């Protein structure tokens, strides 16, 4: 499907950007094709009227742990113990995976189109990335780091 985003205020993300109006953003196959004057013939596009709302380039979050909501912890917790509990049964793994998928979707709905995961639960991040790419889940692009590396202590 081809879309034309109209009646929006465009912020282009450049250093000296100025809000731009009277333009349409043309999207084909999920990618921006062009930005054209709003007088352009749009008969091949489904019109999405932004009603004066802002539109800007997708944001990138370069440090994400999808196992958490991103909100500050109210108190210190033993993460290793918590991970062991979560990963100990199929029920808790299923619940945790649904939460991880929800946190990723929240990122996308907040304007973040790419997240860089830097450690998560088991293979959740990789599985979610694959499901998003297959179109079975909704979420941002995810370059996955999978697991962390630890250097041995040098005596």
Spans of model-derived segments:
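Metal-associated gating/positioning segment near the N- to mid-region
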Residues: 54-131
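Alpha-helix-loop-beta-strand connector modules within alpha/beta enzyme cores
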Residues: 135-140
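Conserved small/polar residues in nucleotide/adenosyl-binding loops
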Residues: 147-153
């Amino acid at each position: 499907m081809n879309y034309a985003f109209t009646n929006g205020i465009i912020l282009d993300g450049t250093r000296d950007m100025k809000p731009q109006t009277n333009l349409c953003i043309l999207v084909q196959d999920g990618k921006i094709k062009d930005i054209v004057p709003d007088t352009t013939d749009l008969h091949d596009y489904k019109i999405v009227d932004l009603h004066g709302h802002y539109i800007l380039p997708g944001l990138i979050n370069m440090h994400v742990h999808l196992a958490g909501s991103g909100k500050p912890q109210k108190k210190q917790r033993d993460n290793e113990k918590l991970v062991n509990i979560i990963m100990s049964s199929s029920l808790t793994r299923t619940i945790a995976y649904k939460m991880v998928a929800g946190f990723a979707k929240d990122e996308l709905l907040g304007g973040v189109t790419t997240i860089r995961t830097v450690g998560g639960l088991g293979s959740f991040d990789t599985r979610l990335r694959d499901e998003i790419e297959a179109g079975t889940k909704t979420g941002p692009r995810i370059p996955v780091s999978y697991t962390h590396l630890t250097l041995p202590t040098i005596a």
